[in-house]
């Protein structure tokens, strides 16, 4: 599954790799990779495989899940598709409460004590999805963990999830994707060193330097 989803993401250009012309993230980080999983919704086969994959992840790793929660906004459609396949209730969670109306942060019916799995499209540092987890926990839910399409596998994310004692699983990951990209000739072999060095310390720009 990891290889299949990685190929999908590369072939539809949901993931772009440019180690020699790095992207600038909103945080200011210079990155050789950019991921836009919203594109997956436009491709029925890809969308189907992601939904089936998320269903299997949830059944395998989060036994007893009662509610599927999507992160606003990118996680919502994938949560809905997975919940439909699981015949489970679904809700979604904003990063912060609405400033008007009822001021809801959680939209949908969810009750105290219910076992919830959060669906996210992408895990970078883990900060935003863990805010969603915290909101659900504050509402009295038992959050079993997070299921996502892709993770960069950053050390910061691993540490953040461990600190909160929240497990997470993904359909594919950075190592798989870069290996598949090399196989598909989407990157040159010489680029692999830069890609590995960036992942070790994304906040440093030393990965962009040429090494002998």
From Swiss-Prot:
The keyword Glycosyltransferase applies. Orotate binds at residue 124. It comes from the Bacteria. Signal peptide: none annotated. Pathway: Pyrimidine metabolism; UMP biosynthesis via de novo pathway; UMP from orotate: step 1/2. Keywords: Glycosyltransferase, Magnesium, Pyrimidine biosynthesis, Transferase. InterPro entries: OPRT, Or_phspho_trans_dom, PRibTrfase_dom, PRTase-like. GO terms for molecular function: magnesium ion binding; orotate phosphoribosyltransferase activity. One of its GO terms (biological process) is 'de novo' UMP biosynthetic process. HAMAP family: PyrE. Homodimer. Belongs to the purine/pyrimidine phosphoribosyltransferase family. PyrE subfamily. This is Orotate phosphoribosyltransferase. It comes from Bacillus pumilus (strain SAFR-032). The lineage of its organism: Bacteria, Bacillati, Bacillota, Bacilli, Bacillales. The gene is pyrE.
């Amino acid at each position: 599954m990891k290889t299949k989803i990685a190929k999908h993401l590369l072939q539809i250009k949901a993931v772009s790799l440019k180690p020699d012309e790095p992207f600038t993230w909103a945080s200011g980080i210079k990155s050789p990779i950019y991921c836009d999983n919203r594109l997956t919704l436009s491709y029925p086969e890809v969308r189907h495989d992601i939904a089936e994959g998320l269903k299997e992840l949830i059944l395998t790793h989060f036994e007893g899940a009662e509610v599927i929660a999507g992160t606003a906004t990118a996680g919502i459609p994938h949560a809905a598709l997975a919940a439909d396949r699981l015949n489970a209730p679904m809700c979604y969670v904003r990063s912060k409460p609405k400033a008007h109306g009822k001021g809801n942060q959680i939209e949908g019916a969810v009750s105290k004590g219910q076992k919830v799995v959060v669906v996210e499209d992408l895990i970078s540092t883990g900060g935003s999805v863990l805010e969603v987890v915290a909101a659900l926990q504050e509402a009295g839910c038992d959050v079993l963990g997070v299921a996502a399409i892709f993770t960069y596998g950053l050390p910061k994310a691993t540490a953040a999830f461990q600190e909160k004692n929240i497990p997470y699983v993904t359909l594919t990951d950075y190592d798989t994707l870069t290996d598949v990209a090399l196989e598909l000739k989407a990157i040159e072999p010489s680029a692999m060193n830069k890609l590995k060095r960036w992942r070790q310390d994304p906040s440093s720009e030393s990965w962009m330097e040429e090494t002998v």
